[in-house]
Amino acid sequence: MLDLGWSEILVIAVVLIVVVGPKDLPRVLRSFGRTTAKMRAMAGDFRRQFDEALREAELDDMKGLVDDVRKLDPRSEIRKHLSPLEEAGKEIRSGLSEAAKAKPAASSLPAADSKPAEPLKNGATSLGPEAPPPVTGETAAPKVSEKAEVGAVAASPGTSAKQAAPKAKAAAAAKAPTKNTASAPAKKPSPRRKKTAGTAP
């Protein structure tokens, strides 16, 4: 507290004896001792109150930390960090389902437009060169989709190049234009002649 050496204490004692006098010196020393004790007690109380306030503040901080730990739910934290991954997964799934829906719809359109082949008539072995049917908006669209479907069959990810070629040829053969019965004029059957008994053919 005060750095007083023996020589300094001796100087203070001599000054007190001279100033106060030998008669009143014991009473002054007692009052000085009491005052010093009171000041020490007050300093101790202040220190205790200050330490107590610090402990309460630390306890409040500790209580806050304990409450935070109790409120901490690791599952919610993990969900919060994984939610972007879930959203990305949902986007991928929706994209795949849309692609899967689009592929069957594209392959079903050319199948609906195909027409059955006309059987050969009168023992003919092949169809002769005839003029192709007139191209309209309805017949032009299947040809474009036929090429797209042949390309899709050839480029499907599950087939190799050797497997894709026969599939493409088979698809092209199945979609080949056939003779349209509605475009050719219908032949009228020749009228039958009545046979009479008196005429020779």
From Swiss-Prot:
Coiled coil: none annotated. Residues 96-201 are annotated as: Disordered. GO terms for cellular component: TAT protein transport complex. It is a single-pass membrane protein. It is found in: Cell inner membrane. One of its GO terms (biological process) is protein transport by the Tat complex. Its main location: membrane. It comes from the Bacteria. The keyword Protein transport applies. The chain crosses the membrane at residues 1-21. Signal peptide: none annotated. Keywords: Cell inner membrane, Cell membrane, Membrane, Protein transport, Translocation, Transmembrane, Transmembrane helix, Transport. Residues 189-201 have a biased composition (Basic residues). One of its GO terms (molecular function) is protein transmembrane transporter activity. Residues 102-114, 159-187 have a biased composition (Low complexity). It holds the Pfam family TatA_B_E. InterPro entries: TatA/B/E, TatB. The Tat system comprises two distinct complexes: a TatABC complex, containing multiple copies of TatA, TatB and TatC subunits, and a separate TatA complex, containing only TatA subunits. Substrates initially bind to the TatABC complex, which probably triggers association of the separate TatA complex to form the active translocon. Belongs to the TatB family. Part of the twin-arginine translocation (Tat) system that transports large folded proteins containing a characteristic twin-arginine motif in their signal peptide across membranes. Together with TatC, TatB is part of a receptor directly interacting with Tat signal peptides. TatB may form an oligomeric binding site that transiently accommodates folded Tat precursor proteins before their translocation. This is Sec-independent protein translocase protein TatB. It comes from Chelativorans sp. (strain BNC1).
